[in-house]
């Protein structure tokens, strides 16, 4: 499967730096250390609730308003929240955004799957991933720049899903949770996604067996072999799926670090996001050429 993995990687737009185990493991370890620091400084944090009772429509409106400080103004569009038919709940994702027609991006739809347990903070961050400042926001923002129509034929899932994952991680800090609680949950989400992505590369590039995968997760204190077997079989059947989320996310984090160094005291989150959004979906090596001098 190695050749197929490389094809999936290149097609997603990751460039040549995809198999940077050290980079991904370093990100996981950094998130682990941040989690330890939060727990050390806030020993009672696990007793805090992550209850959020707003409706999906209210959450989306709240997110659209809250992102204005760090993200450029969104395109004026309509958003409809719909629910997956009961007969399809077993087969579809917890939530998903439908890409609008190329000639009418003002009408947008997000589907929520009530067959999945999307409660509290998970619903909030999922709507951020699919809506604001995630897929819906990125798609309509770029469409509003009047790009060459050929861009609609190109698919760079590393950029698209990397952006949505980055947006999801940012959304924890836009939620009603305390900052330490938001940080702990965000780091945990990042760690789990990172472990899956590293396993994805290990299985399909290095040929990890189930035993190798069990050992990988055990290194980080995850030792339920039945759960790991399910993860292993899922990854085995869908090569490179987790990479478009995690590697795309880490590429954006690394790009942001370099952009901050370049801008120095003039760094602006809103300007960084604006430049990244205006380049639009592309291989990260191309994105860098436009953003890093």
State what each model feature region is:
Residues 1-293:
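N-terminal maturation segment of proteins
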């Amino acid at each position: 499967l190695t050749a197929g993995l490389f094809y999936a990687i290149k097609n997603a737009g990751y460039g040549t730096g995809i198999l940077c185990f050290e980079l991904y493991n370093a990100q996981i370890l950094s998130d682990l250390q941040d989690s330890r620091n939060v727990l050390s400084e806030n020993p009672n944090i696990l007793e805090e609730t992550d209850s959020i009772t707003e409706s999906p429509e209210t959450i989306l409106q709240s997110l659209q308003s809250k992102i204005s400080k760090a993200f450029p103004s969104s395109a004026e569009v309509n958003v409809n929240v719909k629910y997956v038919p009961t007969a399809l709940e077993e087969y579809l994702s917890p939530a998903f955004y439908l890409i609008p027609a190329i000639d009418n991006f003002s009408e947008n739809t997000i589907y929520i799957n009530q067959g999945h347990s999307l409660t509290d903070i998970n619903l909030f961050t999922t709507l951020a991933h699919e809506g604001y400042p995630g897929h819906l926001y990125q798609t309509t923002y770029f469409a509003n720049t009047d790009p060459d129509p050929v861009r609609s034929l190109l698919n760079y899932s590393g950029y698209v899903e990397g952006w949505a994952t980055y947006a999801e991680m940012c959304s924890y800090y836009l939620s009603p949770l305390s900052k330490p609680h938001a940080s702990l949950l965000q780091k945990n989400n990042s760690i789990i996604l990172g472990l899956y992505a590293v396993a994805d590369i290990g299985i399909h590039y290095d040929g990890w067996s189930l035993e190798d995968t069990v050992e990988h997760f055990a290194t980080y204190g995850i030792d339920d072999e039945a759960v790991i077997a399910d993860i292993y079989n899922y990854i085995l059947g869908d090569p490179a799926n987790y990479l478009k989320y995690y590697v795309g996310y880490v590429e954006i984090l690394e790009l942001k670090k370099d952009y901050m160094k370049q801008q120095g005291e003039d760094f602006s989150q809103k300007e960084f996001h604006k430049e990244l959004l205006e380049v639009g979906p592309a291989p990260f090596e191309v994105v860098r050429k436009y953003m890093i001098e």
